[in-house]
C-alpha cells in the first residue's frame, strides 16, 4: 500500500510516498481504507522532533476517516463497508497517512451520512482538546 512516511526529522520536505505492507486487523481491531486523515500541530512537532514517536522511519497521523475493509476477531459493531472515523491510540498508534490503517474498534464511531470524510477526519484529536 502507499503511505506518506519519513526517514529523517525535518520540515515537510522529508515526507515521501513509499510502499509499505498493508496491515491486518488483530483481535478487537478494524482495517480502514483511509479516505481522509487529519493534520494536527502534534503531527508537525513529531515530524520535526519525533517527540512522541521516536526516531524515523515512521508514518504520522492519528485522525482518520474511511471505510471498514475488514474486522478482527471479536468485532461486532462494524462490518466491511461501514463508514467510520476515529482517533488511533495516542500517542503510539499513529499511521493514518496511508491507504489503510488498523486501529482498535473502540476508537472509531460510525460516520453520519451528512458528514464528509474530510470534515470527519478533522474532529477526533481537536475534539479532545
Cite the ranges covered by each PLM segment.
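Short structural boundary motif marking the start of a folded domain
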Residues: 1-4
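Short beta-strand-to-turn element immediately C-terminal to the catalytic PLP-Schiff-base lysine
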Residues: 6, 47, 69-70, 102-103
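Extracellular beta-rich ligand/substrate-recognition surface
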Residues: 6-14
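Short beta-strand or tight-loop elements
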Residues: 13-18, 64
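Extracytoplasmic/periplasmic beta-strand context in beta-sandwich domains
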Residues: 18, 82, 98-99
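Glycine-rich beta-strand-centered segment in the early N-terminal region that forms part
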Residues: 21-38, 48-90
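Cytochrome P450 core scaffold surrounding the K-helix E-X-X-R motif
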Residues: 42-45
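NAD(P)H dinucleotide-binding glycine-rich loop of Rossmann-like/cofactor-binding domains
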Residues: 77, 87-129
Amino acid at each position: 500500500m502507499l503511505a506518506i512516511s519519513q526517514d529523517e526529522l525535518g520540515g515537510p520536505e522529508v515526507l515521501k510516498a513509499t510502499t509499505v505492507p498493508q496491515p491486518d486487523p488483530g483481535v478487537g481491531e478494524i482495517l480502514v481504507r483511509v479516505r481522509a486523515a487529519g493534520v494536527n500541530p502534534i503531527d508537525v512537532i513529531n515530524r520535526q522532533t519525533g517527540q512522541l514517536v521516536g526516531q524515523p522511519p515512521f508514518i504520522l497521523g492519528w485522525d482518520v476517516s474511511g471505510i471498514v475493509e475488514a474486522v478482527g476477531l471479536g468485532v461486532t459493531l462494524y462490518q466491511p463497508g461501514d463508514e467510520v472515523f476515529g482517533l488511533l491510540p495516542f500517542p503510539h498508534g499513529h499511521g493514518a497517512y496511508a491507504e489503510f490503517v488498523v486501529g482498535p474498534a473502540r476508537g472509531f464511531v460510525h460516520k453520519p451520512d451528512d458528514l464528509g470524510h474530510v470534515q470527519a477526519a478533522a474532529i477526533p484529536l481537536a475534539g479532545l482538546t
